[in-house]
């Protein structure tokens, strides 16, 4: 009997903080660039009332999945406009906190290294939560931020409910079955 080889494991090589931030920013720009064309969101497709409640749910789910990045941009823009009305300082502070969340939590792939120590995910999350609470308290912008996000969500929900999603295809199989593209398999 031969001894079994040791299991193959993935070992993460710590990267400097600059590399972590630049990779996170690259991931963020890649995610934002995956939005659907704005003309497709607004002008193409007809708007109508859903025929039934199940049709409403299906239409909403399809539109939310298809236009997710666009809807995120709309909600973020409404929140930014609400913060501008509060004060420019609030917009800058909350914008900086949102940038920290995007870079250090949502789009970070590698461990964060500060002063030759690896910072754990829970520590990063705790710091981001505390910084967010401090920023909202410091700028007194909780109400304005809630109003802006609510208006953005309301706009997205209205669009998702009334935009006909019959011609939207989320996957290639759906496009083939719907007759949008032909299949080479015969």
Curated annotation (Swiss-Prot):
Tissue occurrence: Expressed in roots and trichomes.
A GO cellular component annotation in the UniProt record:
endoplasmic reticulum membrane
Where found, per UniProt?
Endoplasmic reticulum membrane
Looking at the UniProt entry, the stretches that span the membrane are 66-86, 87-107, 119-139, 142-162
- A matching Pfam family: PRA1
Is the keyword Endoplasmic reticulum in the record?
A: yes
Q: How does it sit in the membrane?
A: Multi-pass membrane protein
Keyword annotations: Endoplasmic reticulum, Membrane, Transmembrane, Transmembrane helix, Transport
Q: Which GO terms describe its biological process?
A: vesicle-mediated transport
User: Which protein family is named in the record?
Assistant: Belongs to the PRA1 family.
Q: What does this protein do?
A: May be involved in both secretory and endocytic intracellular trafficking in the endosomal/prevacuolar compartments.
Name of protein: PRA1 family protein G2
Q: Please tell me the species this chain comes from.
A: Arabidopsis thaliana
Q: Which gene encodes it?
A: PRA1G2
